[in-house]
Curated annotation (Swiss-Prot):
Pfam families: Endonuclease_5 (PF04493)
Entry's EC annotation: 3.1.21.7
Organism placement in taxonomy: Archaea, Methanobacteriati, Methanobacteriota, Archaeoglobi, Archaeoglobales
GO molecular function: deoxyribonuclease V activity; magnesium ion binding; RNA endonuclease activity, producing 5'-phosphomonoesters; single-stranded RNA binding
Protein name (database record): Endonuclease V
Cofactor: Mg(2+)
InterPro entries, alphabetized: Endonuclease-V
Binding, Mg(2+): 38, 104
Compartmental location: Cytoplasm
Length: 221
């Protein structure tokens, strides 16, 4: 596997983060599609699944699956180097000028403001929203019942949202080319009663189906 000095990787992330734009490249009312991307690992391979949904109807119109060799080890906060290119390869054929991307991974709510969603945004020059089930970075400050701001100092870098009655919050942050408030609004508009927004939930379901097909003895449900 490719090995690099962690200080050099941090420098790359910090340099990329300086290119982040926290303004809407596409007004939400002009969005026509949302693409969700999710990934899973089988031994030394990564399965990347992307689904394209109409917006705001949230109907699946296309999907893509890529299986590639893993070329980088698992290191927390450096997942963009492990998962970034495979995710880009799965998504790039589904996005157009009226599409945003939802990523199972962090955006700027990351110690160096450069999570997986940020990497994908900057590579494809498309708006991305990062969605995670755990808080990686940022102080939570309650805004209202079930909603918290994620702060880095005094700056809002995302939100934590209790997306269904009995679930723990999800963590939402822009990757690039979308504001934190628009990332929250888009996420809310993609919810259909489940913890995860539909683009991520359906991509996750597809990923599990593909993984089962590739590993017949898997107990994955």
């Amino acid at each position: 596997m490719l090995q690099m000095n962690l200080e050099e990787l941090r420098r790359i992330q910090e340099e990329m983060s300086r290119s982040v734009v926290l303004e809407d490249l596409i007004p939400l009312e002009e969005l026509e599609y949302v693409v969700g991307v999710d990934q899973a690992f089988i031994s030394d391979e990564v399965v990347s699944c992307a689904v394209k949904l109409t917006f705001p109807e949230l109907e699946v119109v296309d999907k893509a699956v890529r299986v590639e060799k893993v070329t980088f080890p698992y290191i927390p906060t450096f997942l963009m180097f492990r998962e970034g290119e495979p995710a880009v390869n799965a998504v790039k054929g589904l996005v157009d000028d009226r599409a945003a991307i939802m990523v199972d991974g962090s955006g700027i709510a990351h110690p160096r403001r450069c999570g997986l969603a940020t990497y994908i945004a900057l590579k494809l020059r498309k708006p991305t929203v990062g969605i995670t089930k755990k808080r990686l970075f940022g102080e939570m400050v309650e805004v209202e019942d079930g909603l918290w701001r994620l702060l880095d100092g005094s700056e809002t870098i995302g939100y934590a949202l209790k997306s269904c009655r009995r679930c723990k919050p999800i963590f939402i942050s822009p990757g690039s080319y979308i504001s934190p408030d628009s990332a929250l609004e888009l996420t809310r508009k993609c919810l259909k009663g489940y913890k995860l927004p539909e683009p991520i939930r359906i991509a996750d379901k597809l990923t599990k189906e593909v993984k089962r097909e590739l590993t017949p003895t898997s107990k994955l449900k």
